[in-house]
Amino acid sequence: MSELKSEQGGMKKERVRKNALLLFSKPPIPGLVKTRLTVLKDGVFQPEVASGLYHCMLFDVVEICCAAMADLERESAERAQAALAAGEEVVRDEYEMIISTTPAKNVEVMRKLFSDAGEWPRELVFLCDEGASFDEHYNQAFEKTWARGADCILSMGADMPALTKADVRAGFNALHKLDGVAGGGIVLAPDQEMGVSVIGWTRETDFDHSGVFYNQEGLTVLPAYIDKARKQGFPALYLPPIPDVDTMADLMHNITLVEALNYCAQYDDVTPPWRTAQALKEMGWDEVRVPPNDLHDPREEIDK
C-alpha cells in the first residue's frame, strides 16, 4: 500500500488491486485449431481456412479485452480520485493481459504472431501452461498468474467472436464484489453447450480446476464447477452467457452475432469483431439462411 494525502489533509492508504485477464489459446496453425470446423472431423472447411478464421477471432478477442480493460482502468482512476477527495479508502485497479499457450515452443510463436501484427493497445504477456490434462494445464496457468501478483483472475478462451467489452467488465466487476468476501468465491459465464466460456476467482479463494474437465461422474463443465463450488462452500456469481465456436452449428449462430455486433458498433460503445467479420465475408459465410420448416407448435387456432 502507498499513502496519499486527501483534500482534508489526512493521509489515506491506497491499495492497488491487480487484475489479470488470462486468455488460453493455441497458435492458429492448420490442423491444430478448430478442427471440428474442418473436413478432418465433422466440418466443411479446409484446415487452412478454419485456422485463418480462428486467427481473426483471436485478434478480435484480444482487442476487445484490451478496450474493456482500458475502460475499467479509467473508471477505477475516477473512483480513486473521488474516494481520495472524500477521505475514503482508495482502491486503484490495474489490469494485465496474459496469453497462455502450449507447449513451451509456442510461446515464441505466439509472441511473434502478435508482434508481426503491429502495436497493441497494451503490453501482452505470454506464458506456457503444461500438464497431462485440461485440468492440469488450467491449474498451472492460474498458478503462474498468481505468482505474477494477481489478486483476481478472469479466464477465457479466444474462440468467442461475440465477446463484448460489457462481458469483460461484468466479469471483473463480479470479481470485485467477491474481493472482500472471507474465503473468496468464483464467477462464471456459461457457453451454449453446458460448458463455461468465462471462469475466475480471487486470490483468497482456495479453488482450482481439478476434476472439472472430463468429469468422472459424467458432469459437463458448467455443472462440474457449480458442484465443486457447492461442495467447498464457495459463493458463485453468474455472468451473462457467451457463446463460443467449436462446431458448425456454433459457427452459424456466431455468424449472426458478428454481423449484429459490427452493425450495432455504429451506434453503441461496442468494439466490433471486425477481423472475423471480414474473414467470414471473404469465405462467403457472412450470412445465414435457413429453409422454412413446420417444426413448430400448432397454430391453427392462432393464425386466422
What residues fall within each predicted segment?
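N-terminal nucleotide-binding beta1-loop-alpha1 segment
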Residues: 9-39
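Active-site-proximal specificity loops/subdomain of glycosyltransferases
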Residues: 80, 105-141
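Conserved donor-nucleotide/metal-binding helix-loop-beta segment in metal-dependent transferases, i.e.
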Residues: 163-193
